Amino acid sequence: MPSVSESDELIFFVNGKKVIEKNPDPEKNLLFYTRKVLNLTGTKYSCGTGGCGACTVMVSRYNPKTRKIHHYPATACLVPICWLHGAAITTVEGVGSIKKRVHPVQERLAKCHGTQCGFCSPGMVMSIYTLLRNHPEPTPDQITEALGGNLCRCTGYRPIVESGKTFSQKSTVCQMKGSGKCCMDPDEKCLESREKKMCTKLYNEDEFQPFDPSQEPIFPPELIRMAEDPNKRRLTFQGKRTTWIIPVTLNDLLELKASYPEAPLVMGNTTVGPGIKFNDEFYPVFISPLGVPELNLMDTTNNGVTIGAGYSLAQLKDTLDFLVSEQPKEKTKTFHALQKHLRTLAGPQIRNMATLGGHTASRPNFSDLNPILAAGNATINVVSREGKDRQLPLNGPFLEKLPEADLKPEEVILSIFIPYTAQWQFVSGLRLAQRQENAFAIVNAGMSVEFEEGTNTIKDLKMFFGSVAPTVVSASQTCKQLIGRQWDDQMLSDACQLVLQEIRIPPDAEGGMVEYRRTLIISLLFKFYLKVQRWLNEMDPQKFPDIPGKFVSALDDFPIETPQGIQMFQCVDPKQPQKDPVGHPIMHQSGIKHATGEAIFIDDMPPIDQELCLAVVTSTRAHAKITSLDVSEALACPGVVDVITAEDVPGENDHNGEILYAQSEVICVGQIICTVAADTYIHAKEAAKRVKIAYDDIEPTIITIEEALEHNSFLSPEKKIEQGNVDYAFKHVDQIVEGEIHVEGQEHFYMETQTILAIPQTEDKEMVLHLGTQFPTHVQEFVSAALNVPRSRIACHMKRAGGAFGGKVTKPALLGAVCAVAANKTGRPIRFILERSDDMLITAGRHPLLGKYKIGFMNNGEIRAADVEYYTNGGCTPDESELVIEFVVLKSENTYHIPNFRCRGRACKTNLPSNTAFRGFGFPQATVVVEAYIAAVASKCNLLPEEVREINMYKKTSKTAYKQTFNPEPLRRCWKECLEKSSFFARKKAAEEFNGNNYWKKRGLAVVPMKFSVAVPIAFYNQAAALVHIFLDGSVLLTHGGCELGQGLHTKMIQVASRELNVPKSYVHFSETSTTTVPNSAFTAGSMGADINGKAVQNACQILMDRLRPIIRKNPKGKWEEWIKMAFEESISLSATGYFKGYQTNMDWKKEEGDPYPYYVYGAACSEVEVDCLTGAHKLLRTDIFVDAAFSINPALDIGQVEGAFIQGMGFYTTEELKYSPKGVLYSRGPEDYKIPTITEIPEEFYVTLVHSRNPIAIYSSKGLGEAGMFLGSSVLFAIYDAVTTARKERGLSDIFPLNSPATPEVIRMACTDQFTEMIPRDDPSTFTPWSIHVS
């Protein structure tokens, strides 16, 4: 190889500061570097795969050709540090900070209430900030698109979008979609009338600081000089195991590729990076040709466009946008098809990192672009050192990786040529994914047809399908047989049969959904057929008939709209003192810190001297005996200090049925067997891979509820309530309907995974733990038991958690004990951060449920008798399963009075990781079954489900089935307001009209009511304590036993203290929750955090005010600070402990009666959806929510909880699907496999109203709203059910069918039975083992 001038110096800038690294390690990424080297912890680790956006940063590069600076978002977890040469990186700290200046983006995100737990907030800030650097006055659509790669589990996205829209040229935060009028304008019909004393503004735009784009930091001039330097040198960075080479010229690149033919070319690292992380791929050499000019050229000719392989997908989209606007429509059909897919392919961060060449070369089977490029006759321009430039057709053989059509190892893709389309050629791209954006396709297709000029005779036809085989496949034989045919219905019928014969998906194919994917192949083909038929009609209306009018809506995918809406809540009494903050929509106490990245989470804490990191080794078998455990290789690995097993537990390894370390037997895949402690997490993880475990399987292995029933395997005794004479009533009803509903589980997907820092103390066997938990006392209990020391020696500190939703009630106790045992054995601090995949595997989630019902009713819809059975899949240990099944049974009537009612429930023991608490605690599962049988009764009676709900709803003060008295008046009010103000009946009529005019798309509406019980039926869990200190300067330090999970609990407690002490809220500070300040605290769950802790804070403050009252009487006109000084001088204690005994709840299961709950939260939600019957996709058009909030202490926080819970519930009922193998292995272990809602799934119109009432039992007559909105998400499920029912009726099918949860596209499509579902081949279940199974 000729001598080349080289350098080993990496130069880049971070937040305006120059960074120089000599020989950086190519295996280190930017996220690690910013957090661990530069101590910039605002950028968060959440998934590690580029799928959540929490680690978003802004990358800025200078292009010497255009002489422009390009700003774009990137996920730091996928960016190798060596990739940064010549780049300027901006992290959230570089945008603004409390110490210096808070940027308007950060301020508005916080003040618009766009943060809750705050873990996703820095990523949200960076996405909006990057957009503003490119578009200082963005459109609402640009804001929505910019946030498409960021996940939030708390807020429901609406306030985040709203904060971004404040930067739009004409703010649209309170405008109807398209009308330009305020939602509250009397002429607008989104809400039919204005409420007296109702407010709609959660923040004051006048408080925002102005945004001046001219004041942003400049791009470092040194980087411009570097980019324009004509004498650039090759860069070579030699790491411990790998070498990273950055060539300067094309010849240099080709020389390197010839010398290292197996070295991957890394441009965006979106393919190579995940392969290294998850598939243990290793490459000794990486070549990164980012700066090679020839890879970044674009050239247009009369025949088409040539686009450089180095173009990012975002640049590709911009180029296509320009070409489509400049060229005649007939020439750009391929470009248009690519444009459409580029809008939803991944998220903006990945689109700005991934390149056209990398995407084309890697040829993933799920590729959205390659099928279209192939259909559009694209060719690949390939070069090599030998000078043998060649054009490789981007066709079936290339995509199927046939050797004769593949790239040679030494070749480099230079560019892609995309020809213009011919006049009589039509190209289309089609896809269907679990959600609209940032999700791999379940099936996609690129199709092209060319006709003999002026005819509908097929001259050429191409069809390529993705996600149906290990590679993208071509239906080439089908296409050959159709050449010369007319484009008509008979051709379509033959094409469907042929393509199903040619493309065979095995019944046990990876990814499952086999029958659905087979259906999608021909459903997408039919869509293409319709598109072409419509296009032919446009070409010559006289010669070619148009498609039927009822088919037109099938042509287009659902558009992505910017959400609009309004929030209504009761205004504060104008007589209330100005400094009293109770009732005001106050920003989250940590909102600004969330947005600036200065809110400290556990892994943001600085490293401690001699700190070790912990990695877990988990079982790969569901039920087996451990025959051997060999840790010798792990112990010999670099940096490893020790391996910890069950033998190292000084105390209890099995505490209350929960096992820290498996010892002789494993009872689920994912059970912890041992942990490895090392100096770095990478060393610990590498060593963990070298632990050798041998097993002998034990029978039976029980995975599903049905298998548990078969083996009589249960975790708890049966729970039962019954009223009336059920058996007698069944004999005296007009009709009986029976059925069963399967409700699958749900992953918490809190943005911050389980995180613990355990620090052994030098004296008295003390241990200090910092962790994110909902239940510090429980952690203390488990650690105490494991270490065999008194609880008083264990101190648990909890500042905040990055989301929890029930997943941090019990699990941190087990994991905390595992961590503490490791710290105890090594005598060194241990940092234990679960990776997302391990977190999802180990901690499990919501209980899957099987519900069976038998309902007796009269022909008018009145239900006289119900016999319901519930079974939950509890997993392998008790955890919270018994309590969950109790809640399921107690809450199983929802809002309905059924005089003869029997409900039974049991928690099943299976060989899955133990399921645990989750927001709603069984209510979201149980009530789906209730509403399902309501819908079944409605169908039998030929009534609307809403009519049956109204008929059977509680109407006056009554007793529940468990004999608790309650007044349903607030329920009736929410129900009535929801029906009226959502214009349900008018919109239902409009939907019917739409459905009559559209065969392949249907709209559905549903209104569901809710009676949600707050707190738990165990009295001692409802107690709380608080500690309040007043300092001599008048400032107040507040602490209590509640945990901040994002719900704003501390903010509300500050409001309470401010009112009770009659001081401004700025005087009150909350530091942390700790077992050393408030011991023996109950868990923060059950929607009761503000209730019980608020009472305790109130009590403490009242005690202090009683002490201060004599002082105040002496000096009534004095200031607070003067009173405090006087009190101190008179030796009056300025500290007080407050206590709340708790709600006195009880439940006697032997008598089947009690008063298990202090009060109920009532509500109703109306949702409207549109369903694509050909694909199973759906779009949520509008949601109206009415929740009985009584008197809201903080409407902004309460509305945030309602909206966030609703979107989380909507995800539970639609997109979120956990997939298990028949052997109990969880497949869904990250955002690429598990799809929580993104910004594109939220309602296009979203209206939330907090209905005022009274609740004298709670503090300030408030109610706990943390969980109530979760079940209301089922209004989307039942709206889908309504739409599918309409489709089935039109097709002559039964309108009673099991629409199980979640209603994924697969479930929806296969329920819409038609000629295409009937056409697909079926397999005998006894002849194969499916790839995945349902566990409910």
From Swiss-Prot:
Cofactor descriptive note: Binds 2 [2Fe-2S] clusters per subunit. Binds 1 FAD per subunit.
Miscellaneous comment: AOX genes evolved from a xanthine oxidoreductase ancestral precursor via a series of gene duplication and suppression/deletion events. Different animal species contain a different complement of AOX genes encoding an equivalent number of AOX isoenzymes. In mammals, the two extremes are represented by certain rodents such as mice and rats, which are endowed with 4 AOX genes, and by humans, whose genome is characterized by a single active gene.
Protein name: Aldehyde oxidase 4
Gene that encodes it: Aox4
Task performed by this protein: Aldehyde oxidase able to catalyze the oxidation of retinaldehyde into retinoate. Is responsible for the major all-trans-retinaldehyde-metabolizing activity in the Harderian gland, and contributes a significant amount of the same activity in the skin. Is devoid of pyridoxal-oxidizing activity, in contrast to the other aldehyde oxidases. Acts as a negative modulator of the epidermal trophism. May be able to oxidize a wide variety of aldehydes into their corresponding carboxylates and to hydroxylate azaheterocycles.
Chain ranges of the FAD-binding PCMH-type domain: 237-423
Organism the protein comes from: Mus musculus (Mouse)
Binding annotation for Mo-molybdopterin: 116, 154, 804-805, 1045, 1086-1089, 1201, 1265
Gene Ontology biological process terms from the UniProt entry: xenobiotic metabolic process
Active site: 1267 (proton acceptor)
Subcellular location, record wording: Cytoplasm
Catalytic activity: an aldehyde + O2 + H2O = a carboxylate + H2O2 + H(+); retinal + O2 + H2O = retinoate + H2O2 + H(+); all-trans-retinal + O2 + H2O = all-trans-retinoate + H2O2 + H(+)
Binding-site list for [2Fe-2S] cluster 2: 117, 120, 152, 154
